[in-house]
Amino acid sequence: MKQLVIAILAVSSISFAACNSGNQTSENKDTMSMDKMAMSDTSSTTLTATIDAPVIKASFTNVSTDVAAHIAEVASHYFHIKHALVSNDSTEAKNGATMMLQVISQFDNSLLSADEKAAYTEHISAIKEHADAIIKSADVDAQRMHFAELSMHEYELIKAFGAGKKIYYDHCPMAFNSKGANWLSESAAIQNPYMGTKMPECGSVEQVIE
């Protein structure tokens, strides 16, 4: 029990340090070292074990193989955009959004049940809208604004259908001048698409979707 408490306090300290200014050089070096450890595969397992976030199940439990594959493919291009924004790469974000739109345009809606179609249609139109806006955006800051909106609807889509694996719903309180924003991740390790290379570890896991 004592070791678990220490582990939780350690993770909390990392999150606090990551979300504050980087002017304290010696502290930053320690934080960067600990963050790199958290990004490794073995450390991610430890981090997951200490995350105090609710786990939710996808609403639809009997999705067809074709539909599940489509939702997973849309999610993969969402993560493509996310990783590009983490790296401040506007061009690659556009590439991810372009591929997302291609996948959506090729999907056969007749594969969906009536309830599935209602849930899918409600959010996929907004996903398409903001993916298109990311393609047309002139800079990475504008792309991040649209990504925040896209993330809201991608979150609802994955809550409904799942993604074939565990997905983490993250929050950064400092994004957009402390208005805050959310995003989805394939890993418990925080990689912030809104703060980019400036503060990539700022944020926390709010939910886990299975």
Segments the model singles out, each with a brief description of its role:
Residues 3-210:
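Intrinsically disordered, low-complexity terminal tails/loops enriched in metal-binding residues
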